[in-house]
Curated annotation (Swiss-Prot):
This is Calnexin homolog. It comes from Schizosaccharomyces pombe (strain 972 / ATCC 24843) (Fission yeast). Residues 244-310, 314-371 are annotated as: 4 X approximate repeats. It comes from the Eukaryota. The lineage of its organism: Eukaryota, Fungi, Dikarya, Ascomycota, Taphrinomycotina. The modification Phosphothreonine is found at T551, T555. It is found in: Endoplasmic reticulum membrane. GO terms for cellular component: endoplasmic reticulum; endoplasmic reticulum membrane; fungal-type vacuole; membrane.
Length: 560
């Protein structure tokens, strides 16, 4: 069957074009993971009995004292995968989409050495991307006893958080007011973007130093640094002085810098009553304006419904339509000139403003010592850290965490990153570059394909007008197939190499072996019966025919 031949050709062409655009990854020798020798209060690479160290939580989540939901999200440890994966490396994976997840690790002994650097570092890989969800961790202010939840207090929250256009890396710490004993959150004021991309690992590092400075690094690069005193909202230290809340502005205090000129007089020619808009005095009614014709008329084709009851429903009134005469002419009904801006409009008059001779200045309450003021030279003294917890919501599954470091050595954290992150960096960045390149190439190919298809249809419209009806009907089927499945259509066009050649090839392929009568405008009864049978077959097997092998049909037998 010739339709099968062309369909199979189209399929091969499509596969050929796809294959020519594909860029298969070259096979590379997998990198091998070696457990680090770095030591710290926490160096977690999820080897061995990880489930004895990390306890998933099944606690209830409460918001404003009301139970919201349970932490039902599943946690697993899985070997790394992807182009940059280290063979044998494992990571903690947040598995479920649209779910709350919570898990925690408790230190053998609380960490509380404020005279040393505090370094927090870990890797995050959103294997399927992260459009809305958190990937930050918390350094905990109390033991969890395996029941991590939003009610467990924390000292520091650090890491990426992304939802829609909000994309940032958090650094939040809690500071204790020495006067009241209360803790308040201090948020980093200018938060860097997370740089999260599907299947790409990022390394996040936080360094807090005893001199009250900090650094946030992403992939080893310092993206934010500053002072615990000056770069957080609200500030750590309250103001030394505040405005006196009991101070009152004197009654004779003049704080208006300008006043209306008391000597100004409204000009005699100032017309406050002049309208803002006036009819255009130069406008002329169009000659074809039908002033006696109504704009709307009853619809002459409207019919009273059969079930309309005048006694119950009232008098039936047909719907109205725009008067056709009004559409043909310039307009109908009473003609009015268009409105224009009044050149003489000036609006209400008001005297000009002049400097106020009695102006004293803007009034402020006097300053008094802040009764709530306190000083703290060491906001980096966060207090004892009892463990690490993840308490997260995510809309995407399979968020991977690996190579977690919590300790006091910047050098050791860098060494760990060199061992685990840098080997993945090159391979994953090559993948990212390849993905971006293929996306650009795909956009370019799609644009060219659309242009080719548009030209093809333009040429076909010209030729179709000269084709006999029975021929045009058959060719139409294939043109519709090209439009509905442009991959096949563009492949055929690309292989044949010429838009005109495509149409002529289709024409002669189908009809060169047919009898002259089949190209004439007349059609015999036998041919009509044959065409109707073919039409029914193609309609019932339309999906199958584009990928069907060559088969016989009554039409094919007659043509062969």
């Amino acid at each position: 069957m010739k339709y099968g031949k062309v369909s199979f050709l189209a399929l091969l062409c499509s596969l050929y074009v796809r294959g020519s655009l594909a860029d298969p990854e070259s096979e590379q020798e997998p990198l091998v993971f070696n457990p680090t020798e770095v030591k710290a209060p926490l160096v977690e690479q999820f080897q061995g009995a990880w489930s004895e160290r990390w306890i998933p939580s099944h606690a209830k989540r409460f918001v404003n004292g009301i139970e919201e939901m349970s932490y039902v999200g599943e946690w697993t440890v899985e070997e790394s995968s992807g182009p940059g994966a280290l063979k044998g490396e494992a990571g903690l994976v947040m598995k479920d989409e649209a779910a709350h997840h919570a898990i925690s690790y408790e230190f053998d002994e609380p960490i509380n050495e404020p005279e040393k650097d505090l370094v927090v570092q870990y890797e995050v890989n959103p294997e399927e991307g992260l459009n809305c969800g958190g990937a930050y961790l918390k350094l905990l202010a109390e033991p969890t006893h395996g029941e991590m939840s939003n009610s467990i207090d924390y000292r520091i929250m650090f890491g990426p958080d992304k939802c829609g256009v909000n994309d940032r890396v958090h650094f939040i710490f809690k500071h204790k007011n020495p006067l009241t004993g209360e803790y308040s959150e201090k948020h980093l004021d200018s938060r860097p973007a997370s740089l999260l991309k599907p299947g790409i690992t990022n390394l996040y590092t936080l360094i807090v130093k005893p001199d009250q400075t900090f650094e946030v690094r992403i992939n080893g690069d310092v993206v934010r640094q500053g002072s615990l005193f000056y770069d957080f909202i609200p500030p750590v230290l309250p103001p030394v002085e505040i405005y006196d809340p009991e101070d009152i502005k004197p009654a004779d205090w003049v704080d208006e810098p300008e006043i209306p000129d008391p000597n100004a007089v409204k000009p005699d020619d100032w017309d406050e009553d002049a309208p803002r808009m006036i009819p255009d005095p130069d406008a002329v009614k169009p000659e074809d304006w039908l002033e006696d014709e109504p704009l709307y008329i009853p619809d002459p084709e409207a019919q009273k419904p059969e079930d309309w009851d005048d006694e119950e429903d009232g008098d039936w009134i047909p719907s109205e339509i725009i008067n056709p005469k009004c559409i043909e002419g310039a307009g109908c009904g009473e003609w009015k000139p268009p409105m224009i801006r009044n050149p003489n409009y000036r609006g209400p008059w008001s005297p000009p403003m002049i400097p106020n001779p009695e102006f004293i200045g803007e009034w402020y309450p006097r300053k008094i010592p802040n009764p709530d003021y306190f000083d703290d030279d060491h906001p980096s003294h966060f207090g004892p850290l009892y463990g690490v917890g993840f308490e997260l919501w995510t809309m995407q599954p399979n968020i991977r965490f690996s190579n977690i470091y919590v300790g006091h050595s910047i050098e050791d954290a860098e060494r760990l990153g060199n061992e685990t992150f840098l080997p993945k960096l090159k391979a994953e960045r090559e993948l990212l570059s390849k993905q971006e390149s293929m996306e650009k190439q795909s956009m370019h190919v799609d644009e060219e394909s659309n242009q080719i298809l548009e030209k093809f249809l333009d040429v076909y419209d010209i030729i179709k007008a000269k084709l006999p009806p029975n021929v045009a009907e058959k060719v139409d089927y294939y043109v519709e197939t090209i439009i509905e499945t442009p991959e096949i259509g563009i492949a055929i066009v690309a292989v044949l190499g010429s838009l005109t050649a495509v149409i002529l090839t289709c024409y002669f392929y189908f009809f060169a072996s047919s009898s002259p009568a089949s190209l004439s405008t007349g059609t015999t009864e036998a041919e009509k019966e044959q065409q109707e049978k073919f039409k029914q077959e193609t309609e019932t097997e339309k999906i199958d025919v584009s990928y069907a092998p060559e088969t016989e049909s009554p039409t094919a037998k007659n043509e062969d």
